[in-house]
Curated annotation (Swiss-Prot):
InterPro entries: aa-tRNA-synth_I_CS, aa-tRNA-synth_Ia, Anticodon_Ile_BEm, Ile-tRNA-ligase, Ile-tRNA-ligase_type1, Ile-tRNA_ligase, M/V/L/I-tRNA-synth_anticd-bd, Rossmann-like_a/b/a_fold. Its EC number is 6.1.1.5. Its cofactor is Zn(2+). Catalyzes the attachment of isoleucine to tRNA(Ile). As IleRS can inadvertently accommodate and process structurally similar amino acids such as valine, to avoid such errors it has two additional distinct tRNA(Ile)-dependent editing activities. One activity is designated as 'pretransfer' editing and involves the hydrolysis of activated Val-AMP. The other activity is designated 'posttransfer' editing and involves deacylation of mischarged Val-tRNA(Ile). This is Isoleucine--tRNA ligase. One of its GO terms (cellular component) is cytosol. It comes from the Bacteria. The keyword Coiled coil does not apply. A motif ('KMSKS' region) lies at residues 614-618. It comes from Helicobacter hepaticus (strain ATCC 51449 / 3B1). A motif ('HIGH' region) lies at residues 57-67. Keywords: Aminoacyl-tRNA synthetase, ATP-binding, Cytoplasm, Ligase, Metal-binding, Nucleotide-binding, Protein biosynthesis, Zinc. Pfam families: Anticodon_1, tRNA-synt_1. The gene is ileS.
């Protein structure tokens, strides 16, 4: 007889292979058809809310692996809160304005055609480009298994959204937090236009390199207690010296006065002496001793304030940087800190204006050598005026920014820009900066050091320049008085314009006549007004998303999103957003709503190849999410995210994904075994107190492990959660429990109590496993649930209905036995058995008996160690194979089993009189025949 046919072997329709690339799209289509996200939104109404507000990706290009990491993390967290029983909201969004889209349009139609287009047509082309990639990216995000309100996403270019961005600007006007002032930007004097960073390319350029001595003022000499002192500066832009108002020193450095009266950074003294003989060190000072003292500009005799700046390099130069806030970004920001004057004597064409004469920026007798002359053509005149203060002049070749259109060198030039004031008291005597820092103290950060990053950035940041000189964006729609050049900030006018934007979008700013932008009460002013040419910084757009998307008192009509309330429970982005979206959102929310827009901030690192290098097409090391999905399935990518310590930078490669695939197969195979052996119907489940002690042990371990894992989930430490769960699945569950249950599952009668007890335990474990993996391996959990028995499903229709159930809720898990000791017994026994196998003395644990000193655990050890029997002293006449001892000196002896092997269960327990089968197997077969 073939006894194999009498065994109850595992049986499940759940396939061993997931065939994920083929099956995932069908499952997602089913979810979409069922309007699953809408169901999830409504499933826990009335419960605790959890709203993750989506940081909008840019609507340009396909997704890269960083996008995948970000969106999968968000999806895991939203789903985790859903499976916790919370009322979740997640509305995806897109950032639609900005220079990259303008560039793409120009590349497509050509610069000449773009320059001849009217603004409305150009913006239409930009809008179409953005919409195209929103659809592409939406499909790609959903292919990652991400659930959200993709039917009603937010787009910053929607008319109502543009109106809301503009209304945020109006709120700042009301708070008195806007100011117009000059700020240096890249300027192409050859094209007479401002340039964005992306429009600047670096080329080698020959420049004059000069060392100039600024004599300290009498009061400065007195303060320092010295009789003479000249601070040496080094610059490669001599034409900026007329606009000098300061000298910046590095606050972390020491400075020396030489015996010849010159002052340079101590660290650079030797290097400077290679160029100029300035003598040897005579006295040393801390940089702070010079702060706010004055020196004299030798070009024009004007005072130059000594300031401290972290930007001052100690790698080259003198450690003292000539500072002209109108001609440099670092100079400008340090100027804001110290209140330095912004002087701009250069016109649109790169020529010195009459201002250079009227302000006395050069000696009057030399003015005609400057006014109307190109700045680069005035160096010889500058050298002549400097005289002996010019310590050395040379020519160097260095990398210098050039205009991408004219290929001429660009300059930094201060122009009128709009700013949000951070240091002006506006609310309960607090400045915006103070309020923002105060609100940050209420925010929970993951990781915690993220708080220090954004805190120090805001603490040290200057006022926020929100104006840009581009076409594709939300206009700073202010009407300017032609005579006074002052903006008309009347609330009725601003609100009237906002209403127009709400209906027709902000393209109306360019297409409408000024009179049509004014309310009836102000139309008489039209002839005296002109339109501002600025648009808003795109960070203002994304920083306003909370006001347009989340429920709040400032939300305008037309922004109909069911996305949760302000403040959001979480913002989650890459660590670079401490400088970006987290900061812009915080500042605008504090300015308008007087509170932070988020309760928690979670950040992740960046993704690199296996060698830690940045991915690029030229290196051939790009790993595309779409390729992974096509070849391996998004589940592998999702598990990679969950297993990664994502708060740091992450590496990804085919080899790493292969390792992740192996982890996935372990999880899938465990689920498959559980499905194949668990109870089929609820009536097969045993009663609360009918579990065997080993079943109670595994369920108590299961509860402990998953409770610990959920604690890690609560802190968003998914890798640690999976580590403890994987250890349980591999060691306690598969390595011990499932192994020792196989005999009962396969060989006992189908209705035996102990078999049904194991099957009941497997149902409880499977529920916990599926509930745990569902936020991460949603496709797999969904598939497994569909292949589950009625016993597991119970009253639930889908995996998304499955609640978090502990094993202790279903069964009495009280244990009196010492399983810590039993695990040590098993460990020692396994070591001895492995040695016996290596020596080819036995092939299986079923070939041995064990002598135990404690009679009460004979029956337990029999099953626990998968041996053919446990005995006391009566075993001594058997063939001894090995012995082992516990730490407490308890000794166990391993003997060879003497009885015959049962041909059905393979245990060596058949007496000579019993034939080929043991008593249990004989009884089961007899029952089967009935």
């Amino acid at each position: 007889m073939d006894y194999k046919e009498t065994l109850i072997l595992p049986d499940t329709s759940f396939p061993m292979r997931g065939n994920l690339p083929a099956n995932e799209p069908h499952t997602y289509a089913k979810w979409r058809d069922e309007k699953l996200y809408s169901k999830l939104k409504n499933a826990h109404s009335g419960a605790k809310n959890f709203c993750l507000h989506d940081g909008p990706p840019y609507a340009n290009g396909h997704l890269h692996i960083g996008h995948a990491l970000n969106k999968i993390l968000k999806d895991i967290i939203v789903k985790y809160h859903y499976f916790k029983g919370e009322n979740i909201r997640y509305t995806p969004g897109w950032d639609c304005h900005g220079l990259p889209i303008e560039q793409q349009v120009e590349q497509k139609i050509g610069k000449a055609k773009k320059d001849n287009l009217n603004k409305t047509k150009l913006r239409e082309l930009c809008r179409n480009h953005a919409q195209k990639f929103i659809q592409i990216q939406s499909d790609e995000f959903q292919a990652l298994g991400v659930l959200g309100d993709f039917e009603n996403p937010y787009k910053t270019m929607d008319f109502a959204f543009e109106a809301q961005i503009y209304r945020s600007l109006i709120e700042l006007v009301k708070e008195g937090l806007l100011a117009e002032r000059s700020k240096p930007i890249y300027w192409s004097w050859a094209c007479e236009t401002a340039l964005a960073d992306a429009e600047v390319e670096y080329q080698d350029k020959q420049s004059d390199s000069i060392f100039v001595a600024f004599t300290l003022s009498d009061s400065a000499l007195q303060s320092l207690g010295i009789s003479q002192g000249k601070v040496i500066i080094w610059t490669t832009t001599p034409w900026t010296l007329p606009a000098n108002v300061g000298i910046a020193l590095n606050p972390s450095e020491s400075y020396v006065l030489t015996d010849k009266g010159y002052i340079v950074a101590k660290a650079l003294l030797e290097k400077v002496c290679e160029n100029i003989d300035i003598g040897i060190s005579k006295r040393e000072f801390k940089a702070q001793e010079f702060e706010r003292l004055e020196a004299i500009n030798p070009l024009n005799g004007r005072t130059s304030l000594i300031v401290l700046g972290e930007h001052v390099s100690i790698n080259d130069g003198t450690g003292a940087v000539h500072t002209a806030p109108g001609h440099g970004e670092d100079d400008y920001y340090i100027g804001l800190k110290y209140g330095l004057e912004v002087i701009m004597p250069v016109d649109d064409r790169g020529n010195f204006s009459p201002l250079i004469e009227s302000m006395g920026l050069v000696p009057k007798e030399f003015a005609n050598e400057f006014v109307g002359k190109n700045i680069f053509d005035t160096h010889e005149s500058i050298f002549k005026i400097l005289g002996k203060a010019l310590l050395k002049q040379d020519v160097i070749t260095h990398s210098y920014p050039h205009c991408w259109r004219s290929h001429k060198p660009v300059i930094y030039r201060a122009t009128a820009q709009w700013f949000i004031l951070l240091d002006k008291p506006f609310y309960q005597g607090k400045t915006l900066k103070e309020l923002a820092l105060e609100e940050l103290d209420k925010v929970r950060f993951y990781p915690q050091n993220g708080k220090n990053r954004i805190y120090s950035m805001i603490e040290n940041r200057p006022d926020w320049c929100i104006s840009r000189q581009r076409d594709w964006g939300v206009p700073i729609a202010f009407l300017i008085d032609k005579i006074t050049n002052v903006a008309l900030l009347d609330e009725a006018v601003l609100e009237h314009i906002a209403c127009i934007f709400e209906k027709e979008g902000c393209d109306a700013w360019w297409s409408y006549e000024i009179k049509d932008l004014l309310p009836p009460s102000h139309k008489h002013l039209a002839e005296n007004l002109t339109k501002s040419k600025h648009i808003l910084d795109v960070w203002f757009d994304s920083g306003s998303t909370w006001s347009a998307v989340l429920e709040n008192e400032y939300k305008g009509a037309g922004n109909n999103y069911d996305a949760g309330s302000h403040p959001a429970d979480m913002y989650l982005e890459g660590s670079d957003q401490h400088r970006g979206w987290f900061q812009s959102s915080l500042l605008l929310s504090c300015a308008i709503a007087k509170r932070a827009p988020y309760k928690q901030i979670l950040t992740h690192g960046f993704t690199f190849d296996r060698n830690g290098e940045k991915m690029s097409k030229s290196k051939g090391n790009v790993i595309s999410p779409s390729e992974i999905i096509k070849t391996q399935g998004s589940e592998i990518l999702r598990l990679w995210v969950a297993l990664s310590h994502y708060q740091s930078d992450q590496n990804i490669s085919d080899e790493i994904l292969k390792q992740v695939g192996e982890q996935y197969r372990k999880i899938r195979n465990t689920i498959r075994f559980l499905l194949a052996n668990a109870s089929q119907n609820s009536q097969d489940m045993v009663e609360k107190d009918e579990l065997d002690v080993i079943d109670r042990w595994i369920l108590s371990v299961c509860d402990r492990v998953f409770d610990e894992a959920y604690e890690y989930f609560d802190e968003y430490e998914f890798a640690k959660a999976f580590q403890v769960v994987m250890s349980f699945l591999i060691n306690e569950l598969s390595g011990i429990y499932l192994d020792l249950c196989k005999d009962i599952l396969y060989c006992d009668d189908v209705s035996s109590l102990r078999r049904r007890a194991i099957q009941s335990a497997l149902v409880m474990i499977l529920r916990r496993v599926l509930h745990f993996i569902a936020p991460v391996l949603t496709y797999t959990a969904d598939e497994a649930f569909r292949h589950s028995s009625a016993a597991l499903k119970g009253e639930y229709e889908s995996i998304f209905d499955l609640p978090k159930l502990s094993c202790a809720q279903g069964y009495n898990l009280e244990i009196n036995e010492d399983f810590t000791r039993l695990l040590r017994v098993r460990e020692k026994f396994t070591e001895s058995l492995d040695n016996l196998k290596k020596q080819k003395i036995v092939k299986s644990s079923l070939e041995v008996l064990l002598q135990s000193p404690q009679e009460k655990e004979f029956a337990l050890l029999d099953r626990w160690l998968i041996v053919s029997g446990v005995c006391g002293k009566e075993c001594k006449d058997k063939e001894e194979l090995a012995r082992f001892m516990l730490e407490d000196k308890e000794e166990f002896v391993i003997y060879r089993a003497q009885n015959g092997r049962c041909e059905r269960c393979w245990q060596f327990i058949v007496e000579e009189s019993e034939g080929k089968l043991c008593k249990r197997c004989t009884s089961v077969i007899a029952q089967t025949k009935k």
